[in-house]
Amino acid sequence: MKKILFLAHHRIGRSPGQRYRFEQFFDFLETNGIQCYLANIINENDEKNLYHSKNILKKLKVGINSFFRRWKHLKDIESFDLVVVYREVIPTKSTLFENYISKKNIPMVFDFDDAIWVKDVSDVNKKISFLKDEKKIEKIIPLCKHITCGNDYLANYASKFNSNITIIPSTVDTDLYKPIEKHNKDGQVKIGWVGSHTTVKHFEMITGVYLKLKSKYKDKIDFVLIGDETYHHKKLGIKGLKWENKIEVELFNSFDIGIMPLPDNEWAKGKCGMKGLLYMSVAIPSVMSNIGMNKDIIEHGKNGFLPVGEKQWIEVLSKLIENKELRKKIGDSGRKTVLEKYSKNKIKKTYLDLYTSLMK
């Protein structure tokens, strides 16, 4: 059997990005004669120090430990037929490991799903941002045999440094993510957002919209935020919930409307619309900022909405709050879009064919 080594930051099942880009295809690849190995450098305790602690020494210790873990991973690298690097081998300025792999007689694939060349540092990690170099991607891409990325915008950037590029959109396991019948007896409409502690700032971008809607509809609506359990907003009655893999499909299905506000900047243009696709996969109407790949996914008013400005956000959300039939119509259309274009089952053979061709 052929063997692929996937180099990523997080353990299997921990990172949504890793799951939607490659982890969910492991079973399919293995049934087709390809063994998949994931080598991660950040454990559960490291995550607490990286994402929740402000102790710089603890963060630096995570970095040092990650460095030595990577060296161990690469000791037997020549036993693999292909190496797939997700975003970077180690989260520092260094490209030492990528250079090391490139000198071996093993093809290397670089996969990314964000505009990672743009600086975007969370508040909790600002003091160690000097250890990062967003532009190192320009040094990594030329070292690779092939590049895979999530949309045209990312591909256009990568093409400056490497011509061997395949665009593979991030996809949803539609056998897992599917609608569940709602039993919302009180008629309250739940408006949901899913993200993380580092992206909650995007949810907050349109707080003025939420406050006006809350003032208008009062207890008829409820805002739900998943992914940052430390988040609180007294006026909106929000207490953030933890993202839990075991119940994530139920969590998404608890929404009546899904939202994805984004800033209008270079970083947002690189996003692959994953939040919106997840809402759509469970037939929840998706309301997304009119930017980047969102415009490729959504046909405004048909399978979702792309409001521009506070006034349109309020108008669109008000229509959906007041009209259950519209929510169902848009939700069903969104689900159809995902099944036709962004389903794991539609994309899995693309990965198989690409990886197989690179290992010949």
Predicted region positions:
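An aromatic- and histidine-rich active-site surface loop
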Residues: 10, 14, 19, 83-106, ...
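Conserved catalytic-core segment of nucleotide-activated headgroup transferases in glycan assembly
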Residues: 12-28, 38-39, 173-176, 184-254
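Acceptor-binding helix/loop patch of EC 2.4 sugar-transfer enzymes
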Residues: 42-57, 108-138, 173-175, 187
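Membrane-proximal helix-turn-helix segments that form the acceptor-binding/catalytic region
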Residues: 67-78, 92-110, 116-118, 127-147
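Nucleotide-sugar-dependent
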Residues: 90, 201, 245-281, 287-296
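Carbohydrate-associated surface elements
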Residues: 153, 171
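Conserved acidic donor-binding segment of nucleotide-sugar-dependent glycosyltransferases
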Residues: 299-311, 319-325
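A short, well-ordered alpha-helix in the C-terminal region of glycosyltransferases
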Residues: 326-341, 347-353
